[in-house]
Amino acid sequence: MTETTRETEFVALGHAGSEHYAGLETFPNPGVEVVEMVSDELTAVCPITGQPDFYEATIEYRPQALCLESKSLKIYLSRFREQGAFCEALAVQIRDEVAEALRLDRSAVHVTLVQKPRGGITITASV
């Protein structure tokens, strides 16, 4: 387990100051087959112009032993606020880090980012 993931000993959930911890926390799967988490609070900046990009993120996975804790996901997604990233690269990074936290093969995690229109163009990247 990396330093950006935790299992069961929650840091983010119910603790003041937890917004400084940007890791993904997990808990034992209670028996669900598919989990879908959707957030419209993901932001990053264009690595070229520095302009803000706003996203709707959908993360779907088929859990085995572990599930993602939602507050830790919210805080994790907020860490990208100041990061320069293209939509496509961000989708891959999130997929890979979620898969690692859940101890799943990357093929068991699907991430779709819909970048809100800027310049009249909407971008959707899925992995």
Write out the residue ranges for each language-model feature:
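N-terminal intrinsically disordered, cationic/polar leader segments
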Residues: 1-127
